[in-house]
């Protein structure tokens, strides 16, 4: 059983990792 807090944490973690991946990608691209 997945609770709402676990879904919120998973979404927040995915958002942070996506932002870090984009920033790292742009740094390597330039």
From Swiss-Prot:
Pfam families: PsaM. Coiled coil: none annotated. It is a single-pass membrane protein. One of its GO terms (cellular component) is photosystem I. The chain crosses the membrane at residues 7-26. One of its GO terms (biological process) is photosynthesis. InterPro entries: PSI_PsaM, PSI_PsaM_sf. The keyword Transmembrane helix applies. Its main location: plastid. Belongs to the PsaM family. This is Photosystem I reaction center subunit XII. The gene is psaM.
């Amino acid at each position: 059983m997945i609770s709402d807090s676990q879904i919120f944490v998973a979404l927040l973690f995915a958002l942070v990792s996506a932002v870090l991946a984009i920033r790292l990608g742009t740094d390597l691209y330039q």
